[in-house]
């Protein structure tokens, strides 16, 4: 069962995920990056070529952390193991590492659930290391 944007917001709040954005990828153009905040994006643009509003296709997510020592670490997560679209890298201002592991079947519509699980793991899970890359490896090892 797929999730709507409002359901993602609601669940993220209940899960204590520091979510700051849920929307179509082209809506990032009007935003400014916030460090240590989670972004869930729909891989379609808000409007199709005919000017009709899209209903959405597939959720992915990313986060860029800034640590007290000034070091930054970002990561893009797609449950299909695909790289980030150019619009995300332009928004972040640099090339983002991404998870290459495919954990979702093409016949499955649970991408929003996978995004929430990933973001909860890296932000809230009590046994996390608070190192974005190590925690991502630990999350992916569950699949």
Where are these regions (language model features)?
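Cysteine protease-like catalytic core of ubiquitin/ubiquitin-like
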Residues: 40-124
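Phosphate-handling active-site elements
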Residues: 126-129
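Conserved active-site-adjacent core of cysteine acyl-enzyme catalytic domains
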Residues: 1-50, 91
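Intrinsically disordered, low-complexity N-terminal regions enriched in serine/proline/glycine
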Residues: 34, 38, 75-76, 132
């Amino acid at each position: 069962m797929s999730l709507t944007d409002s359901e993602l917001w609601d669940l993220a709040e209940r899960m204590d995920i520091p979510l700051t954005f849920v929307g179509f990828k082209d809506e990032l153009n009007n935003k400014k990056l916030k460090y240590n905040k989670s972004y869930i994006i729909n891989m379609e643009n808000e409007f199709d070529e005919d000017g009709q509003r899209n209903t959405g296709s597939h959720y992915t997510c990313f986060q860029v952390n800034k640590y007290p020592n000034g070091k930054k670490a970002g990561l893009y997560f797609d449950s299909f193991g695909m790289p980030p679209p150019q619009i995300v890298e332009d928004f972040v201002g640099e090339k983002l590492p991404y998870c290459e592991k495919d954990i979702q079947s093409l016949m499955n519509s649970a991408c929003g659930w996978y995004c929430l699980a990933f973001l909860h793991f890296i932000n809230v899970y009590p046994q996390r290391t608070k190192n974005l890359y190590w925690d991502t490896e630990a999350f992916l090892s569950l699949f």
